Amino acid sequence: ERTKAGDTFIVELVGQTRDDVEALLKKFGEMPLPPYIETRLGQADRYQTVYANRPASAAAPTAGLHFTPKLLSDLKSSGIKILTVDLTVGLDTFAPVTSENPLDHPMHSEHYRVTEETLEECARAERVIAVGTTATRALESAATSGVLSGRTKMFISRGYEFKVVDLLLTNFHMPRTTLLMMIEAFVGPRWRDLYSVAIAERYRMLSFGDAMLLNRHL
């Protein structure tokens, strides 16, 4: 069954098991890509992190694309504790903010899961570094609501007080997106200076681009 929902279509696939549905998706579907990527990917794992463990999201958490198994191993060897969270990224993550007042933007909901152990470790940690806006949204949603697993419509924008994340590793985002508004909430107006330097130095932007490590305490 295929029904239109705004600018996208909802397709319902029916199978006997989850494996049947995933097989149908693999056979007939294509990996959703941001609208600015016009070339099909020859290998699907080029748009996937090395630590992804199950199909669910409509987009990869692109800050994680910078990590290799060796880099993760080196980080662990240096004493950095690595914890995981789940956030099922929806297609609306690509949608621009079209409302004149950004606070009127209809924020999409996404499913997240943060274990109690992860939240406790974050509370004990000297500092918490989130890899990507998706991990940030999951951690902040769990800490704010007290719900470890559920759906979140959290819109992190100017004035939000972060409860968990101290540093954020993230790529450079498109203008007029909720992702960029989260960056402004994290570091304030100096994000403009950071982007100006990146543009002047010809950094690569967006999903397959460079990343920056932001410290909200500076």
Predicted regions, residues:
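Surface-exposed, charge/polar-rich loops and edge strands
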Residues: E1-L218
